[in-house]
């Protein structure tokens, strides 16, 4: 069995503030250590359950957040974003995906760093219903026959994801500062929480046969509400239907719908023909930058480095 571990960062154990997720900051370097520890425990869980192969796909921002030299060497690591299949790259040979450190949807009140796909949106709707990233990403993977069987993150993020994939296993992660800055109590929470990641990930892999690919039948109607009308005007270079700050598009399936979403978000029309070499160059640049030129970590009083 080939298990894919997709890694965001906001829902990691040890992280409690936004700048720990913002690339290039000393606080983010601490956040990377937190994420890497979480991912390593999920890798261990997958192999505990006799996975044949494990591939870690880094999905946050430019896609180079895990500290590669600290990852379990049994796993393959894929950083950066790809063109085909859009965003994630090759997903065809995964038997199961485990999604680590997710966050809540744009507009979720009281959530930690909520956003859907990118921070420019105040809400994203599919067929009239507000959706989180799990609704979109899991349905996209489902078009290729790949089920998502595990999620970890704060309570509301997990709750939103499980509505889309109720068969998935989950681990809830606390986002309060005091949880991670209270000495021995915090260290105990981190140890127990990450052991839970390992145990539940193993459970998901063992029960992979019961996990279903999420398929949302078309036709699909997307509505992306930008935070301002100015942002909508700036990003909508494709001439999608637009009313004020809301941009809409239709698709026959999630593959087409997600491709258009990425066009709107990441690829202005005049850049689109050059997307392949640009993606290749960006992967190389950020792999080097984030590996060799990262700042020293600032744990901001956390009880442990990760």
Task: For every predicted segment, state its role.
Residues 6-7, 57-58, 97-102, 151-152, ...:
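Short beta-strand segments
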Residues 126-236:
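Glycine-rich, Lys/Arg-enriched anion-binding loops that position phosphate/diphosphate groups
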Residues 1-4:
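Extreme N-terminal starter segment of soluble prokaryotic enzymes
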Residues 193, 200-306:
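C-terminal accessory domains and tails appended to enzymatic cores
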Residues 19-44:
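Short catalytic helix/loop segments, enriched in acidic residues and glycine
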Residues 73-151, 167-170:
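Divalent-metal (Mg2+/Mn2+/Ca2+)-assisted nucleotide/phosphate chemistry catalytic cores
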Residues 10-14:
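Short acidic, Gly/Ser-rich segments with clustered Asp/Glu that frequently serve as metal-coordination loops
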């Amino acid at each position: 069995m080939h298990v894919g571990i997709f890694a965001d960062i906001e829902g990691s154990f040890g992280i409690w503030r936004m700048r720990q997720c913002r690339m290039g900051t000393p606080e983010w370097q601490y956040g990377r250590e937190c994420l890497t520890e979480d991912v390593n425990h999920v890798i261990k869980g997958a192999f505990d359950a006799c996975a044949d192969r494990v591939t870690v796909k880094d999905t946050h921002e430019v896609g180079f957040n895990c500290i590669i030299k600290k990852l379990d060497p049994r796993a393959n690591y894929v950083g950066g974003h790809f063109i085909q299949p859009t965003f994630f790259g090759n997903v065809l040979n995964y038997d199961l995906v485990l999604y680590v450190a997710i966050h809540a949807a744009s507009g979720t009140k009281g959530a930690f760093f909520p956003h859907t796909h990118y921070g420019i949106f105040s809400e994203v709707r599919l067929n009239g219903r507000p959706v989180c990233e799990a609704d979109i990403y899991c349905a996209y993977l489902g078009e290729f026959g790949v089920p998502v069987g595990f999620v970890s993150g704060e309570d509301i993020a997990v709750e939103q994801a499980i509505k889309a994939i109720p068969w998935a296993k989950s681990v809830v992660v606390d986002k309060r500062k005091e949880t991670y800055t209270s000495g021995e109590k915090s260290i105990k929470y981190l140890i127990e929480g990450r052991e839970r990641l390992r145990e539940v990930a193993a459970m998901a892999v063992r029960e992979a046969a019961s996990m279903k690919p999420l398929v949302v039948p078309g036709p699909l109607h997307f509505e992306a509400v930008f935070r301002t009308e100015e942002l909508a005007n700036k990003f909508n270079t494709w001439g999608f239907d637009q009313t004020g700050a809301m941009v809409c598009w239709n698709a026959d399936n999630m593959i087409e719908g997600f491709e258009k979403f990425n066009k709107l978000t990441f690829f202005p029309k005049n850049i689109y023909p050059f997307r392949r070499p640009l993606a290749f160059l960006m992967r190389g640049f950020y792999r080097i930058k984030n590996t060799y030129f990262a700042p020293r970590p600032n744990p901001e009083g956390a009880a442990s480095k990760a």
